[in-house]
Amino acid sequence: MALHDENVVWHSHPVTVAAREQLHGHRGVMLWFTGLSGSGKSTVAGALEEALHQRGVSTYLLDGDNVRHGLCRDLGFSDADRQENIRRVGEVASLMADAGLIVLTAFISPHRAERQLVKERVGHDRFIEIYVNTPLAICEQRDPKGLYKKARAGELRNFTGIDAIYEAPDSPQVHLNGEQLVTNLVSQLLDLLRRRDIIRS
């Protein structure tokens, strides 16, 4: 079947996004965490999800490693595979946001163009780009998975920040200092969600 087969049409459903959001008691949005490996994306996203859950907010966290165990298990780390990885995640996260959830995504997502495509897919008003800015030297010191060590030794090729480029966001909605305490970063994000009337508490 062709990618845009004329026989495939969009089917609207009687339950709207607004109705789902009303049921949840908050807006459905996508929080896109981006940054180098070891920057703290997953840690901050996980801590924020826990804080939201404690406040009765419906959430789901999509993590870069986890999706490669299932949804993206057939993909490698070439530029083409990385692009497809982000496209798939963007589609899934968009559906979850439509369901009225606050979706947190923690992906290196090194290219601006890919992040822009996700933003366009979910809608500018429901996409919040969160740049976890941590110096490469600090990320290498942390190196929780030992990947930087392997990359420096030549055992791991095409690793972002070493021999593959990371394009930092030009104007992210949120710019976090990844060297700050996680609790401080979570507080900043909760304040943002309240100011934007995404959550109430």
Curated annotation (Swiss-Prot):
Its EC number is 2.7.1.25. It is an enzyme of class 2 (transferase). One of its GO terms (biological process) is hydrogen sulfide biosynthetic process. Pfam families: APS_kinase. It comes from the Bacteria. The active site is at S109 (phosphoserine intermediate). InterPro entries: APS_kinase (IPR002891), P-loop_NTPase (IPR027417). The keyword Zinc does not apply. ATP binds at G35, L36, S37, G38, S39, G40, K41, S42. The keyword Methyltransferase does not apply. GO terms for molecular function: adenylylsulfate kinase activity; ATP binding. Pathway: Sulfur metabolism; hydrogen sulfide biosynthesis; sulfite from sulfate: step 2/3. It catalyses: adenosine 5'-phosphosulfate + ATP = 3'-phosphoadenylyl sulfate + ADP + H(+). Keywords: ATP-binding, Kinase, Nucleotide-binding, Phosphoprotein, Transferase. Catalyzes the synthesis of activated sulfate. PANTHER family: ADENYLYL-SULFATE KINASE 1, CHLOROPLASTIC, BIFUNCTIONAL 3'-PHOSPHOADENOSINE 5'-PHOSPHOSULFATE SYNTHASE. Belongs to the APS kinase family. This is Adenylyl-sulfate kinase.
